[in-house]
Amino acid sequence: MTDFVGPLGVPTVLHEAKHVIGVAGGVGSAPLFPQLRELANRGVDVDVIIGGREAQYVLLADEFKKFCKNVYIATDDGSLGTKGFVTNVLSDLIEKGESFDEVIAIGPVPMMKAVVNVTKPKNIKTSVSLNPIMIDGTGMCGCCRVSVDGKIKFACVDGPDFDGLQVDFDELMLRQRMFKEEEHTVSENANRMCNLMGVSNNAKHVINKGSNARTRTRCKK
């Protein structure tokens, strides 16, 4: 690595609350972890829902248990926890009368959109963390543009955290699809490099494209 730029964006703001639930999808557990831990240290009652396609993609569950009052797990295939999506668990909790001052959702964009679809009708404060494609990290390239409350924002400068109830997720998902071909190329190149280096079958890598880290690939020997 010859160049490094950071930190980008603005610091995360933790709001005053009595009961907060975090919702993490895949690697979203990593940035969610320190936020919920800090809230717990402040005396906030903290719960978390962790989701993944299967058990091996459910991250930091044991670590969350050290300070969260309740840890819920959902997997697409039912290999761990509830079979289904994190939004199924969230909806069930709300329907059973659980009251949350805020929901913090971090994960794939479709997951965060689904969370907002649950919380918006209930007018529950919802924070999301956006990490779309970024090239220069200064807002000049415009790749990470997102509409929030009808205003243009840039995730690298104004984010990554935004009011989820105000994010135009449909536009965001459309813009992300614009770079699928480039992401596929990066993934294929990474696989070839892993093969050349003889990386083991278990190795998993997060590939940085510009200043973004959204493309995940498994190296195969």
Predicted regions and their residues:
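Short acidic, glycine/serine/threonine-rich loops at helix termini
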Residues: 116, 139, 167-168
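Local cysteine-cluster metal-coordination motifs and their immediate loop/turn environment
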Residues: 29-31, 109-110, 131-161, 190-205, ...
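Generic, ordered loop/turn and secondary-structure boundary motif
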Residues: 9, 13, 131, 135, ...
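Iron-sulfur (Fe-S) cluster-binding modules
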Residues: 14-19, 41-45, 61-70, 93-95, ...
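FNR/FR-type flavoprotein reductase catalytic core
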Residues: 1-135
